[in-house]
């Protein structure tokens, strides 16, 4: 619904003049006037936050067993208030994305591959399949405002990692 409303309410007259088919059809690109159609694109935000969260759960809940899933869930629900020791342990003792750690790199590959195949398996209301990407330039800040605490120790409301970069 959001995608359809976006195309109906926000035409791109200038961009449309640059694309094949809009003159001939007399339609804006958002009205289907272009000769070649791709997308729309779903741009992923927070991929390294996802990877680090999964790595934290795998490492601390399943491998080292130094945190129970119940305790982690409670800490997340409370934004780590009263769980600062756990938060510090998660942040400082979890293998993180971007550090050339094979098991984390494999996890990143598996998750991005899964997301890619899931996204392209769906068609938009305009017909073409969705395309995916991991290159948001600035959405990590506003998206972070609405994301709760994460298992690697990130507190609620703070910025997510930029694009597909590791946290810094």
Model-derived features: positions:
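Acidic, glycine-enriched catalytic cores built around paired aspartates
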Residues: 1-168
């Amino acid at each position: 619904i959001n995608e359809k409303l976006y195309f109906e309410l926000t035409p791109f007259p200038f961009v449309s003049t640059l694309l094949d088919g809009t003159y001939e059809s007399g339609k804006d690109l958002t009205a289907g006037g272009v000769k070649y159609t791709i997308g729309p694109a779903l741009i992923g935000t927070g991929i390294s936050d996802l990877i680090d969260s999964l790595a934290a759960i795998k490492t601390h809940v399943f491998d080292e067993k130094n945190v129970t899933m119940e305790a982690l869930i409670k800490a997340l629900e409370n934004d780590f208030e009263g769980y600062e020791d756990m938060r510090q342990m998660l942040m400082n003792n979890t293998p993180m994305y971007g550090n050339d750690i094979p098991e984390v790199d494999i996890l990143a590959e598996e998750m991005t591959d899964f997301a890619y195949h899931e996204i392209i398996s769906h068609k938009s209301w305009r017909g073409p399949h969705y395309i995916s990407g991991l290159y948001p330039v600035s959405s990590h800040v506003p998206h972070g405002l609405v994301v709760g605490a994460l298992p690697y120790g990130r507190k609620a409301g703070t910025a997510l990692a930029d694009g597909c970069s590791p946290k810094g």
